[in-house]
Amino acid sequence: MYDNLKSLGVNHPDDIDRYSLRQEANNDILKIYFRRDKGELFAKSVKFKYPRQRKTVVSYNAAEGYREINGISPNLRYVIDELDQICLRDQTEVDLKNKILDDLRHLESVVSNKIAEIEADLEKLTRQK
């Protein structure tokens, strides 16, 4: 699994925290950030440079004939797909944790309100006697 990342030398893909992608001249720059260990000030990262793929295509304008376009390298596209799988999985886990915590806080609020209501009813009963 994650063969493209392993071919780049990323032996522990589960340690990936996030990535960034930017374009510089005729290159795409991929930077992969790893989770920080306790006590580390900065996250470890690795940087990869991919040349942009150049294609010559027929222009829709008959006067121009052909034109050259730049695109993302197919290898980089495969690596990004794997990175998205890792990063989106982590995001889903964080979202689920936040949802559970929100549900727990809501439940705590409902229970404390119900306890207050029951105590008030008990207080009314004791005053009536």
Curated annotation (Swiss-Prot):
Classify the source by domain of life: Bacteria
- A Pfam family matched in the record: DUF3461
Residues spanning the signal sequence: none
What the record says about family reads:
Belongs to the UPF0325 family.
**Do you know which NCBIfam families this protein is assigned to?**
PRK13677.1 (NF010213)
What's the protein name?
UPF0325 protein SG1947
